[in-house]
């Protein structure tokens, strides 16, 4: 019995768990390597570089496109040649790069003056302009009638006409400030007094002047 135990100790066997771990370690490197993408018209040379070629549909012959450092560069060269030969019907390696996102239409550059007028806000309304009121038409007409009576030969009561003429109210010119209104009113009063004195003197001389 002792001899049998000694033989087992001298020749131990590997446990089954260790054997399965060794098998999984052997398959692990293959899983870590990324799968290479296959591109149209691209082949890898034995020395590692990538060659691109395309078939000309008109001549039915292969066209050499060149040798590139990476497979992506060779695939892009094939896409450019395929668009040249077949147009939009060509099957590409990177269709998203060629077509791209849908472009939105933009407004063309307008002249500077037009763009500024479009962007500038509307002008603000200015302050209300102060308009001066002219003498009433009735007052001007009365003055004209009075002048015509003086030049005519009709005998009228000038004193009565002048009293009724200047007793009528009239509007003074409006201005933006109260001071200007006061000065204008004073000037108008002075002019009115001068006219009354002149007309009274003229009426007095008219009646006292001896007639033939």
From Swiss-Prot:
SUPFAM superfamilies: DNA-binding domain. Keywords: Activator, DNA-binding, Ethylene signaling pathway, Nucleus, Stress response, Transcription, Transcription regulation. Expressed in pollen grains. Induction: Induced by salt stress. Induced drought stress, jasmonate (JA), salicylic acid (SA), abscisic acid (ABA) and ethylene. Down-regulated by freezing stress. Induced by wounding in the flowering stem. Induced by waterlogging. Residues 17-34 have a biased composition (Basic and acidic residues). Residues 1-49, 96-136, 169-212 are annotated as: Disordered. One of its GO terms (molecular function) is DNA-binding transcription factor activity. Transmembrane segments: none annotated. Belongs to the AP2/ERF transcription factor family. ERF subfamily. Transcriptional activator involved in the regulation of plant development and tolerance to abiotic stresses. Acts as positive regulator of tolerance to waterlogging stress. Delays waterlogging-induced premature senescence by regulating stomatal closure and antioxidant enzyme activity. May function through ABI1-mediated abscisic acid (ABA) signaling pathway. Involved in tissue reunion of wounded inflorescence stems. Required for the division of pith cells in the reunion process, which is dependent on polar-transported auxin and the wound-inducible hormones ethylene and jasmonate. This is Ethylene-responsive transcription factor ERF113. It comes from Arabidopsis thaliana (Mouse-ear cress). The gene is ERF113.
């Amino acid at each position: 019995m002792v001899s049998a135990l000694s033989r087992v100790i001298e020749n131990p066997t590997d446990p089954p768990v260790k054997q399965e771990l060794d098998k999984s370690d052997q398959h692990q490197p293959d899983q870590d390597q990324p799968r290479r993408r296959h591109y149209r018209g691209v082949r890898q040379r034995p020395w590692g570089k990538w060659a691109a070629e395309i078939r000309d549909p008109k001549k039915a012959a292969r066209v050499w496109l060149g040798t590139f450092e990476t497979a992506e560069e060779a695939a892009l060269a094939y896409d450019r040649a395929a668009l040249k030969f077949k147009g939009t019907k060509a099957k590409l390696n990177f269709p998203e790069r060629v077509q791209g996102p849908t472009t939105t239409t933009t407004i063309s550059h307008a002249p500077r003056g037009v763009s500024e007028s479009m962007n500038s806000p509307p002008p603000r309304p200015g302050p209300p302009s102060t308009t001066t009121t002219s003498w009433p038409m009735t007052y001007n007409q009365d003055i004209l009638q009075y002048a015509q009576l003086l030049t005519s030969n009709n005998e009228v009561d000038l004193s009565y006409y002048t009293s009724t003429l200047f007793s009528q109210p009239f509007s003074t010119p409006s201005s933006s400030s109260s001071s200007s209104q006061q000065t204008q009113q004073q000037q108008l009063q002075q002019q009115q007094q001068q006219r009354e004195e002149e007309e009274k003197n003229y009426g007095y001389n008219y009646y006292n002047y001896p007639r033939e």
